[in-house]
């Protein structure tokens, strides 16, 4: 472990008398990772020169690198039923259908705990080439890779229509959810 960015003061906005509120800070994090971000609240004590730090939230396995959208049909969705040895890597993360980042692993288009969504598979997905792509690209660039899953096996082209296709609109929603 090493400190990349030291403790940084944030602007805070207290919303009510229960001290519930928000804080905002902009950090310049160098490409790479995985990083961990810790937050805490510093308060003054009644004893001079003594402060208390209250635990805040912690974000684990944060990578700053390249993002790719997985969109398309069978291969993108993982319809290969072949057995393969393709273990996960800490350098490749996947924005899963449940709208959470996770370490990328097969099956990549699984929908456990997902809300109803356009690209939910009816069958059990298998192996996708995109984990191997992410690992290879990450090794070539030396940077983490994030994959955003939006594919659906056997989907017709009209569902990808930018004007009103539900799969296209789902893809745009996922891009917005991840900060794009």
Question: Where are the predicted features?
Answer:
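Cell-envelope and extracellular/periplasmic
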Residues: 1-180
